[in-house]
Amino acid sequence: MFNFAVSRESLLSGFQWFFFIFCNTVVVPPTLLSAFQLPQSSLLTLTQYAFLATALACFAQAFCGHRRAIMEGPGGLWWGTILTITLGEASRGTPINDIATSLAVGIALSGVLTMLIGFSGLGHRLARLFTPSVMVLFMLMLGAQLTTIFFKGMLGLPFGIADPNFKIQLPPFALSVAVMCLVLAMIIFLPQRFARYGLLVGTITGWLLWYFCFPSSHSLSGELHWQWFPLGSGGALSPGIILTAVITGLVNISNTYGAIRGTDVFYPQQGAGNTRYRRSCVATGFMTLITVPLAVIPFSPFVSSIGLLTQTGDYTRRSFIYGSVICLLVALVPALTRLFCSIPLPVSSAVMLVSYLPLLFSALVFSQQITFTARNIYRLALPLFVGIFLMALPPVYLQDLPLTLRPLLSNGLLVGILLAVLMDNLIPWERIE
């Protein structure tokens, strides 16, 4: 049974959980607004959908899924893949409605597939493909892709087709760098009891400084317009985009196993078992499927939740659920949604950049499980550098590739992960000294 007893400590921890959920969610809608070339008035709707879906996904996991204090939110792998596909295909002239429709179909299929994997228990076997070597590459490349997104947000760069008339505004960028340095300084130099509030302090301080330094910045205007498929619908289907989305959903399952395994140390009384993984996959797939009409980034358990649990020392579901309730209230009250929508993208991007830098530490932890030599280093080096090359390759150079392969091959993160999975599981590296 769940204990609903309220204490001061659990409320404070719940508030910290809210800001963790908030910081990981609020930065996403502005990037979708830019990538899909939507009017500024759509930001309120996208943000409200994001908060609502994320809160419900957290509830689903807390009560029916893994039943642990692990945030369920817009997956970084999904986020990076969707932005990459949209930018690449739009630059080749593919209509935005076609991209949005194909992504919706692919995401729905991946949600169904994730549920089937959960019901069947196949996810445990699928997770075995993600060896420590694969996870090193996964963490490195995911960190590279996400930090690129955050740097673009700090610079105010467009997430869609490049605008030749765009000019970087140095004062806003300087403020975002100052916020980044503030959060880093708190985490590095302050005692742990203060350092754990670095994201919260950085967000609020940057928010206030922004409106003090740039008072002419307009606040969010417009009315809330509830609608299905706000990114676009009714377009032609692209098999390549659908295939890439389905593959992304399969790779995304690795986050489920990484998050649950990483929190086992906090829940020793629960023991090990496949049931928890199965329930979590079903919850993730179900929430991904039913939120397709809201056009939110598909979900996954956040491995970064481990850091918050370590910092706060509070592993209870109660605090996590309190944070999710606050997030739900923000989604249901338009005035609160409007308030949090006004946080500038450069500020939220700077805060999130700091929160994802520890992905490098995660990669180094996985690398300690492997003994690299001059001969077996190729299991990591080849997929890593191929993926980096494809991430930096301008989409125009893939123009002549078949439509079925183009979205996949333009995604360096996915290609690198798939190549690493193949090389690590097909070649007997343990026999190679």
Placement of each model-derived feature along the sequence:
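N-terminal signal-anchor module of multipass membrane proteins
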Residues: 1-69, 80-93
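Hydrophobic, small-residue-rich membrane helices and short re-entrant helix-turn-helix hairpins
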Residues: 1-2, 6, 189-204, 223-237, ...
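Membrane-embedded helical hairpins/re-entrant loop segments and their flanking transmembrane helices
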Residues: 7, 31-64, 246-317
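Hydrophobic, membrane-embedded alpha-helices of multi-pass small-molecule transporters
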Residues: 8-25, 168-180, 197-198, 211-215, ...
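Membrane helical hairpin/interfacial module
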Residues: 58-123
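Short, non-helical or kinked segments that cap or interrupt transmembrane helices
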Residues: 66-79, 128-134, 195-200, 296-305, ...
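Interfacial segments of multi-pass membrane proteins
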Residues: 83-88, 187, 305-320, 325-330
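Membrane-embedded alpha-helical modules
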Residues: 96-216, 324-433
